[in-house]
Amino acid sequence: MKLHELHDNPGANRKKKRVARGPGSGKGKTAGRGIKGQTSRSGVALNGYEGGQMPLYRRLPKRGFSKPNRLEFAVVNLGQLQAFVDAGKLDAKADVTEDALVAAGVIRRKLDGVRVLAKGEIKAALNLSVAGASKAAVEAIEKAGGKITVSRPAKEAAAAE
């Protein structure tokens, strides 16, 4: 197979139908919109408008709420940490902080802090300093000979003061 032999399957690309371009096109005059009425005109009704009937989104009750100052954590699994140590992107001997995880590319940004979860296995003895960790993750890290320091997220600490 060569580059010049590549082409779409028959019928994969359809030409766009040009409307309102005379009677010969088959879609002239009313352009497939029918005659008169709201939908024949520009600016058709808004989605969710049911012609004056009480709309569905108002018939149903409100539920729940969004916590405005909710903390959002970047999640890191033990398997990810081990993979980055094996690849040489994370130094197991040095202290592993949230900033070090961002620099190594384990996470893109730390949000309100980093939370370590126990998915996967860890063999490296890491000295971690993060904002949160599950009990299983703490046990696994300590079992591997590492140490984990869980500090409160900066946002939470500021709110407590």
From Swiss-Prot:
Q: Which family does it belong to?
A: Belongs to the universal ribosomal protein uL15 family.
Q: Which HAMAP family match?
A: Ribosomal_uL15 (MF_01341)
GO-annotated biological processes? translation
* Annotated region (Disordered), positions in chain: 1-47
Q: Is rRNA-binding set as a keyword in this record?
A: yes
The answer to whether keyword Transcription applies is no
- InterPro entries this protein is in? Ribosomal_uL15 (IPR030878), Ribosomal_uL15/eL18 (IPR021131), Ribosomal_uL15/eL18_sf (IPR036227), Ribosomal_uL15_bac-type (IPR005749), Ribosomal_uL15_CS (IPR001196)
- Lineage per the UniProt record: Bacteria, Pseudomonadati, Pseudomonadota, Alphaproteobacteria, Rhodobacterales
Coiled coil regions, renumbered to chain: none
The gene that this protein is the product of is rplO
Q: Disulfide pairs?
A: none
Q: What is this protein called?
A: Large ribosomal subunit protein uL15
Which GO molecular function, any one, fits this protein according to its record? structural constituent of ribosome
Question: Subunit notes for this chain?
Answer: Part of the 50S ribosomal subunit.
Give the protein's biological function. Binds to the 23S rRNA.
